[in-house]
């Protein structure tokens, strides 16, 4: 076969390329860079701080207070743009986090019980120890109720830092960090739903439980339509919101209920494709109705070789990483530097909780789990890298800002945000340097 024929055969396996594809391809490539979402999130944060301290600060604050909603009969669903981003947008974020955890537990590395228990133990340490450090400084004080702020880890920024380290760190560390951060975030959102919600209407909440049972029944019966699941999920979100429980918990529960089974195996797909596609390139589709139905069957078969969890992850990753989280940063990260007080007890408590509580809790609980024999360190991972990972987990940013909006009074939020910023920057720098150092030492030992 000549080179020209080979090239033609290869091109036949690709989709046609239009001018718009040449323009959009660089954007598409950027979106799929692992650290890209972290970069966009950082730029959004910087922009929010700049706008909050510019002559446009009042207009910027008023923009997020624009009221949006709808009325259905006697029911009124209305809230500020800021609240829509925090409540509805972050529900999508937590839904994606729960999908990632479900996939890892059923299809990924966390199928190994000892590796899963190490991540769970580390997450428990990362959730429980920082609030203790925080309360050591704030118990009985005005900021006591903000203990939940220091519980969670910003998964997007952690992914960005790990991507910057590249191949200098082992893949086992990446898996450990991401699974720990996901478990950490899910634990934190349960605390938010219970600890920072309003008075609970248990009757209304029972309707939400019926909704979750309906979702489970739909999955059991083999319903595959993501549109139907989205409609039911949206209804559950509204019911939970009316019950007094924070509605973002909807995302976590729905994510964990999402099926991981594939309707169509790849072998089955190949058999269908061989039967449907003309055997010779010279054969032409006539374009009649029957052949149109055949093509629809082939498209459905190709789509269903991915589980609902995988399909939803692929669909939501760009939207969450490049729309939801940047909007959240713009809505919440604006700190007025004119009113900053570096000596605020709340700022100090948040800083200590993240920078000291996170690494100590993660290392301590991980060590206890390994010592008890219920977990083991993955290959190529040492305790120095676990400590460095614990420092990176002190980047609380997105999650911490989210919880701080619920936990503090308006006159305390600026102090909490400042503590979050300083702690996140400190944790990122120390964690990055520690991981580079300990990863290099581990490589030297093995050579």
UniProtKB/Swiss-Prot annotation:
Membrane topology: Multi-pass membrane protein
Subcellular location, record wording: Cell inner membrane
InterPro entries per the UniProt record, alphabetical: Na/H_antiporter_dom_sf, NhaA
GO cellular component: plasma membrane
Pfam families: Na_H_antiport_1
Cell membrane listed as a keyword: yes
Cysteines paired by S-S bonds: none
Transmembrane parts of this sequence: 30-50, 81-101, 117-137, 146-166, 175-195, 199-219, 220-240, 315-335, 350-370, 383-403, 415-435
Catalysed reactions, as listed in the record: Na(+)(in) + 2 H(+)(out) = Na(+)(out) + 2 H(+)(in)
Keyword vocabulary terms for this entry: Antiport, Cell inner membrane, Cell membrane, Ion transport, Membrane, Sodium, Sodium transport, Transmembrane, Transmembrane helix, Transport
GO biological process entries: regulation of pH
Listed Gene3D superfamilies: Na+/H+ antiporter like domain
Keyword DNA repair: no
Stated family: Belongs to the NhaA Na(+)/H(+) (TC 2.A.33) antiporter family.
PANTHER family: NA(+)_H(+) ANTIPORTER NHAA (PTHR30341:SF0), SODIUM ION/PROTON ANTIPORTER NHAA-RELATED (PTHR30341)
Function: Na(+)/H(+) antiporter that extrudes sodium in exchange for external protons.
Protein name, per record: Na(+)/H(+) antiporter NhaA 2
Native source organism of the sequence: Vibrio vulnificus (strain CMCP6)
Gene this protein is translated from: nhaA2
């Amino acid at each position: 076969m000549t080179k020209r024929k080979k090239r033609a055969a290869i091109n036949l396996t690709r989709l046609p390329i239009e001018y718009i594809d040449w323009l959009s391809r660089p954007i598409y490539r950027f979106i799929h860079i692992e650290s890209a979402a972290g970069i966009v999130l950082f730029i959004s944060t910087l922009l929010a701080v700049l706008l909050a301290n510019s002559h446009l600060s009042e207009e910027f604050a008023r923009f997020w207070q624009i009221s949006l909603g709808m009325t259905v009969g006697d029911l009124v669903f209305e809230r500020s743009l800021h609240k829509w981003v925090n409540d509805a947008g972050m529900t999508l974020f937590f839904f994606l986090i729960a999908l990632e955890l479900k996939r890892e537990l059923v299809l990924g590395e966390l199928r190994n019980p000892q590796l899963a228990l190490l991540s769970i133990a580390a997450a428990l340490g990362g959730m429980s120890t920082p609030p203790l450090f925080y309360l050591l400084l704030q118990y009985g004080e005005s900021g006591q109720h903000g203990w939940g702020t220091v519980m969670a880890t910003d998964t997007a920024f952690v992914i960005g830092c790990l991507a910057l380290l590249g191949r200098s760190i082992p893949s086992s560390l990446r898996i450990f960090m991401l699974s720990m951060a996901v478990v950490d975030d899910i634990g934190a959102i349960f605390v938010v739903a219970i600890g920072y919600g309003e008075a609970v209407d248990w009757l209304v909440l029972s309707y939400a439980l019926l909704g979750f049972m309906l979702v489970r029944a739909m999955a059991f019966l083999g319903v595959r339509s993501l549109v139907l699941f989205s409609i039911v999920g949206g209804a559950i979100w509204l019911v939970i919101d009316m019950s007094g429980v924070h509605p973002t918990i909807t995302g976590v529960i729905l994510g964990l209920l999402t099926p991981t089974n594939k309707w169509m195996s790849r072998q089955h797909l190949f058999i269908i494709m061989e039967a449907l596609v003309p055997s010779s390139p010279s054969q032409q589709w006539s374009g009649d109705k029957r052949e149109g139905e055949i093509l629809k069957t082939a498209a459905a078969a190709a789509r269903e070789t991915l589980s609902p969890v995988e399909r939803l992850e692929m669909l939501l990753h760009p939207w969450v990483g490049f729309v939801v989280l940047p909007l959240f940063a713009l809505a919440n990260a604006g700190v007025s530097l004119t009113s900053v007080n570096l000596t605020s007890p709340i700022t100090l408590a948040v800083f200590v909780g993240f920078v000291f509580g996170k690494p100590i809790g993660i290392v301590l609980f991980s060590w206890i789990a390994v010592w008890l024999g219920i977990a083991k360190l993955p290959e190529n991972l040492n305790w120095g890298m676990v400590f460095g990972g614990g420092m990176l987990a002190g980047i609380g940013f997105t999650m911490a800002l989210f919880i701080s909006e619920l936990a503090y009074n308006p006159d305390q939020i600026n102090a909490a945000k400042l503590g979050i910023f300083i702690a996140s920057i400190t944790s990122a720098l120390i964690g990055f340097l520690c991981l580079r150092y300990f990863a290099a030492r581990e490589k030297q030992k093995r050579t």
